[in-house]
């Protein structure tokens, strides 16, 4: 049996982490044969809540959970970690857009990037969840320069899963029968959810999703804004941001990054853009369709896009460049 993995969850006293820590500790992410040591980081003001989270994890008597390190100290949190699930950030509240969070969160991710650089394993895999996730991921990577930019990703699997559900519901199949939707760009209401290449298994056969749907108006006026604004819709109803669905998406994205994607299937993941794919700008974290093998992702190239799609692609790309400039200017 391999040695234990040290897995950091930040914002560990929060609602996403409350769901996520249980999913990781019960073996959903790395399997039932992989021992885990959970590093749980939150601010000192959350100390008593975090103690309660630790008690619950202990009381679950998970067989793969070998140890728990609750802390508000960056050194203790980041030392020798194999995986970082960066959930903690200033929360988004009703009426706020992710851009509004930039000034509050860039300093958090600068400090945590420096801690990652100083204390974590150089092979660490980092998944940034706290919003605005793509730009927080970029800031963190810039302050951990010895860790490859390919080792950082931002969460776009929640949007991917939302898109899959909408397609499945429209054509009347379970979600598992839909694959190869794409989320392009930012995790924001300017993302481009794309079903042009999605495939649906129905009646024992595979069909292009667009053929089964056969309703361009629905794609443009229902599906696209629904996925773009789903997070805000959840906040409007719960008065809190998505928690269980976000935790499930974190597990999905890291699981596929760790173990690989299925043959003939891609997933959406926000990865470092070198400017080589689809004309996306350099030096941002941009959601692309990717395949993954042996822990390494590869962007799926050659997918066609119509003029309407190209327009949405440009909007989300421009937003990410704008976010980057705002974030970097706060350090000047």
Curated annotation (Swiss-Prot):
pH-activity relationship: Optimum pH is 7.6 for oxaloacetate reduction and 9.6 for malate oxidation. Stable between pH 6.8-8.5 for the forward reaction.
Entries under Pfam families matching the protein: Ldh_1_C, Ldh_1_N
Keyword Endoplasmic reticulum included in the entry's annotation: no
Alphabetized GO MF terms: L-malate dehydrogenase (NAD+) activity; NAD binding; protein homodimerization activity
Temperature notes for this entry: Has highest activity between 5-40 degrees Celsius. No activity at 60 degrees Celsius.
Protein's UniProt name: Malate dehydrogenase, cytoplasmic
Protein EC: 1.1.1.37
Source species of the chain: Taenia solium
InterPro entries: L-lactate/malate_DH, Lactate/malate_DH_C, Lactate/malate_DH_N, Lactate_DH/Glyco_Ohase_4_C, Malate_DH_NAD-dep_euk, Malate_DH_type2, NAD(P)-bd_dom_sf
Assigned keywords, A-Z: Cytoplasm, NAD, Oxidoreductase, Tricarboxylic acid cycle
Activity regulation summary: By arsenate for both the forward and reverse reactions.
Catalytic activity: (S)-malate + NAD(+) = oxaloacetate + NADH + H(+)
Source superkingdom: Eukaryota
Family to which this protein belongs: Belongs to the LDH/MDH superfamily. MDH type 2 family.
Binding positions (substrate): 92, 98, 131, 162
Gene name as annotated: MDH
Role according to the record: Malate dehydrogenase. Has no activity with NADPH as substrate. Does not show lactate dehydrogenase activity.
Gene3D superfamilies recorded: Lactate dehydrogenase/glycoside hydrolase, family 4, C-terminal, NAD(P)-binding Rossmann-like Domain
GO BP of this protein: malate metabolic process; tricarboxylic acid cycle
Matches recorded under PANTHER family: MALATE DEHYDROGENASE
Quaternary state and interactors: Homodimer.
Active site: 187
Gene Ontology cellular component list: cytoplasm
SUPFAM superfamilies: LDH C-terminal domain-like, NAD(P)-binding Rossmann-fold domains
Residue numbers binding NAD(+): 11-17, 42, 105, 112, 129-131
Keyword Oxidoreductase attributed: yes
Primary location recorded for the protein, binned into one broad class: cytoplasm
């Amino acid at each position: 049996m391999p040695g234990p993995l040290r897995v950091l969850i930040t914002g560990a006293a929060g609602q996403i982490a409350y769901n996520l820590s249980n999913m990781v500790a019960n073996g959903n992410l790395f399997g039932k044969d992989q021992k885990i040591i959970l590093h749980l980081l939150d601010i000192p003001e959350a100390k008593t809540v975090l103690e309660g989270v630790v008690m619950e994890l202990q009381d679950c008597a998970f067989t793969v959970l070998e140890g728990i390190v609750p802390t508000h100290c960056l050194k203790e949190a980041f030392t020798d970690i194999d995986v970082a699930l960066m959930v903690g950030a200033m929360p988004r509240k009703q009426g706020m857009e992710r851009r509004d969070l930039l000034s509050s969160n860039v300093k958090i991710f600068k400090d945590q990037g420096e801690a990652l650089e100083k204390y974590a394993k150089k092979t660490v895999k980092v998944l940034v969840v706290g919003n605005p996730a793509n730009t927080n991921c970029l800031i963190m990577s810039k302050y951990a320069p010895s860790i490859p930019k390919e080792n950082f990703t931002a969460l776009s699997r929640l949007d991917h899963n939302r898109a899959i559900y909408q397609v499945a519901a429209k054509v009347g199949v379970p979600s598992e029968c839909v694959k190869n939707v794409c989320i392009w760009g930012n995790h924001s209401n300017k993302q481009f959810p794309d079903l042009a290449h999605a495939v649906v298994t129905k009646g024992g056969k595979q069909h292009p999703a667009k053929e089964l749907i056969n309703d361009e108006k629905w794609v443009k006026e229902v599906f696209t804004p629904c996925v773009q604004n789903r997070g805000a819709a959840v906040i409007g109803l719960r008065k809190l941001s998505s928690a269980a669905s976000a935790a499930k998406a974190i597990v999905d994205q890291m699981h596929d990054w760790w173990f690989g994607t299925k043959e003939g299937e891609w997933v959406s993941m926000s990865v470092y853009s070198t400017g080589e794919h689809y004309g996306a700008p350099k030096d941002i974290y941009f959601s692309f369709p990717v395949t993954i093998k042996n822990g390494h992702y590869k962007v799926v190239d050659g997918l066609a896009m119509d003029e309407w799609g190209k327009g949405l692609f440009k909007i989300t790309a421009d937003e990410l460049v704008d976010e980057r400039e705002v974030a970097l200017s706060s350090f000047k």
